[in-house]
Amino acid sequence: VLENIQKDYVACYSFYKIAAESFKKAGKKKQIIDGLEKSADVTLKFNHDLGEVLGMPPQIMTKKTKKKIDEFTAIAKKDFSSLANQYGLMCKKLVENQKQRIDYWEAKGNKIIK
């Protein structure tokens, strides 16, 4: 469960950073960009906090994060809306209510065990 949540944080950090950069380039309102960057900061902090709990060295966390950013950047260049559709709502929920996502992974894990 914790490893899956940590992967979600990496994905959401990457999503928020790319979204903020895309919105900057598109000339969107500063308030929207600031919100995306704040969400990126929150997910990065939780990513690293959880990585430490899991015993993951900082250089490994950085490498995984960079890899995910590169992956999402490639997707966003082709079709940003598909990236937003896949991660936007999930990441918003993760930032607003972590317990909901933990419950999701626990339920999914329980289905596999049964």
Model-derived features: where do they sit?
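Short N-proximal segments of mature Sec-exported proteins
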Residues: 2-55
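Compact alpha-helical subdomains of small soluble proteins
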Residues: 35-114
